Amino acid sequence: MTNMTQQSHGNGSIEHYDAVVVGAGVGGMYALHHLREMGLSVRVYDAAAGVGGTWWWNRYPGARVDGPGSPFYCYTFSEELMQEWDWAETQPSQAQVLTYLEHVADRFDMHRDIQL
């Protein structure tokens, strides 16, 4: 059940959410996804102009996943998405990771609950 409410206060209105998440990086996106699955109303706030967290901010030459294996072994947004997404490399570049995270945000309509 979604419990977002809105109240008038002075010159504006105040919105109330079940949960507020700071940061639209991988962890924040996963929190949004999971909290929504629990039926909660959620708002994510981020200072960046796009989703991705460190993958949005760090665009220096050579930025990439430096650990072995799948880059998101801890965060599975959905099995279907993992099966259909084709990672070109086992250690993808910053651009590839950011493209994936933007796809996740679009796929799960996350932008409606993220304020950048």
Question: What do the PLM-derived regions correspond to, one by one?
Answer:
Residues 41, 49, 56-100:
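Glycine-rich active-site loop/strand segments that organize a redox cofactor
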Residues 1-19, 37-38, 66:
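Extreme N-terminal leader/targeting segments of oxidoreductases
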Residues 106-116:
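A conserved beta-strand/loop element that lines the FAD pocket in flavoprotein oxidoreductases
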